Amino acid sequence: MNQEFLEQFIFKIEKLKKMSDRNAVVNDEFGEYNKVAYIENVLSETRELVKHGEKRIALEDLLENINEVGITLDTDTITLARKAFGDNISPYIEGLLKAMTCK
């Protein structure tokens, strides 16, 4: 896991949160959530995992959580996630990254 690229990826997600409409909502199978609050919550969980040395799990969970509510990312942000994983990307995560890429 590359710490520098992980931090850059998290920064991009923080930027996405700041650029989001404060009234925007996201949905998953359990309900509807304010987009800004949702992103802040998953970022908080991510930071906590990173703090405890669980960087890989933190990035995997962050990707899964934002994908579950249909948030897509630009190719530069996806590239940062790939670089954070280094040469150790599972087929599942690779598929997730492809699904999350803005078309």
Residue map of PLM features:
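C-terminal-biased regions
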Residues: 1-103
